[in-house]
Amino acid sequence: MSTFYTVISWLLVFSYWLLIAGVTLRILMKRRAVPSAMAWLLVIYILPLVGIVAYLSFGELHLGKRRAERASKMWPSTAKWLRELKEYRRIFATENSEVASALFQLCERRQGVGGVKGNQLQLMTTFDDTIKALLRDIELARNNIEMVFYIWQPGGLVEQVTSSLISAARRGVHCRILLDSAGSVQFFRQHHPELMRTAGIEVVEALKVNLFRAFLRRMDLRQHRKIILIDSRIAYTGSMNMVDPRLFKQDAGVGQWIDLMARIEGPVATTLGIIYCCDWEMETGKRLLPPPPDVNVMPFEQESGHTIQVIASGPGYPEEMIHQALLTSVYSARKQLIMTTPYFVPSDDLLHAICTAAQRGVDVSIIVPHKNDSVLVGWASRAFFTELLAAGVKIYQFKDGLLHTKSVLVDGQLSLVGTVNLDMRSLWLNFEITLVIDDAGFGSDLACVQEDYIARSRLLNATQWQNRPYWQRIVERLFYFFSPLL
């Protein structure tokens, strides 16, 4: 009997080390950043079983077999639609400003579609203004309303949006809503989905959280886009979730969330539409394409207006696209660079680009929240401040709530607004959306918003920062080491 237990023990030990060796080899063979690989190896060797389970669940990008098959099947029809769109050459910009030309060229070559002109943009800096405009657009909608959000939380002014959508559906408008399962978990636990479906609104739970399928699809892959489309000619996108900030996370101790949305009329709504259709088909298996270009685009052909490129990122889209776009933007800066983000955990390449910009004389400012709703990200962000301050970057800590806006302004001309945080999850993992605007007028509007943020912020003093308690430095470095996993 003792021999049997001895054999079993040796088999368990052998299997244990074989499993660790196998996962280690898998990490080393995957093409990933060295800091990320080292962080995962550290977790696995310090907490072997926990680390292995965590890596198999969250360490690799698994879209899921069914979604991957749908993505493969939908591409031919999507490619055909894009070819038809490109036949309308008059809507595409042929010239860009000097600071924007490299980025627009990158986007066109990698995504296959150039930036479109003739768009009218309106920046909205408050939740109330956004909802007021949205309710008016929903009331005037005649054909279709599509929405995708990470978080939809009933209550406050959101109830008016729900009622307006129900009214639209009852008068024959096709309404489709795609909501992330994890972000909108409270919504799906309440009666609102059934209420909306009864009225004829299609409500779909995207990327459902299922622990039993954790090894088949990455559970922390999230649908982080925020897009509203109305009659395929009006679009909204930005950082705002469908939540009333007066009611959302009031117990987090960070104040109300501050967001930025853009309302757009013009051909870029068509570009956003095809992205929404891809997300819809990937989640439901149902094909849904925007109206033909000759119906949808022609009314907006004009020489005036804003030139916009759309960057869609996430599984199934050009790899590292948003990361490359941010790097290109930073390296294009010659005079000024202002970046706003709630979560700042940049890649080594992005951090180096930002520091290099400051060191070559660019006026670089980064605006982040003073208090963060994520303790882990908050500490990890602080770990980068010393290097940024040493390079001459100005760091502003917003003190009037949780600044949730995601924006980049380069030389007052090139603007990036959307859903992308300057952290690893947005750069490498989640489904995100970004508008790239080449327009000095819009840049001036965005600069005014950023100046308002700065006026409500505290400039981080380099000397005071160097004198912070030693225990804080230890905590910062600890989270810095694990920042590739956040």
Swiss-Prot record:
Residues of the PLD phosphodiesterase domain: 219-246, 399-426
Disulfide bond sites: none
Segments traversing the membrane: 3-23, 38-58
Chain segments annotated as coiled-coil in the UniProt record: none
GO molecular function: cardiolipin synthase activity
GO annotation, cellular component aspect: plasma membrane
Primary location class: membrane
Catalysis: reaction(s): 2 a 1,2-diacyl-sn-glycero-3-phospho-(1'-sn-glycerol) = a cardiolipin + glycerol
GO biological process, any: cardiolipin biosynthetic process
Key words of the record: Cell inner membrane, Cell membrane, Lipid biosynthesis, Lipid metabolism, Membrane, Phospholipid biosynthesis, Phospholipid metabolism, Repeat, Transferase, Transmembrane, Transmembrane helix
CDD domains (alphabetical): PLDc_EcCLS_like_1, PLDc_EcCLS_like_2
InterPro entries in UniProt: Cardiolipin_synthase, CL_synthase_A, CLS_N, PLD-like_dom, PLipase_D/transphosphatidylase
A Pfam cross-reference name: PLDc_N
Lipid bilayer topology: Multi-pass membrane protein
Positions of the catalytic residues: 224, 226, 231, 404, 406, 411
Class of enzymatic activity (EC top level): transferase
EC number in record: 2.7.8.-
Localisation per UniProt entry: Cell inner membrane
HAMAP family: Cardiolipin_synth_ClsA
Biological function: Catalyzes the reversible phosphatidyl group transfer from one phosphatidylglycerol molecule to another to form cardiolipin (CL) (diphosphatidylglycerol) and glycerol.
Family: Belongs to the phospholipase D family. Cardiolipin synthase subfamily. ClsA sub-subfamily.
Protein name: Cardiolipin synthase A
Taxonomic lineage from the root: Bacteria, Pseudomonadati, Pseudomonadota, Gammaproteobacteria, Enterobacterales
Encoding gene (name): clsA
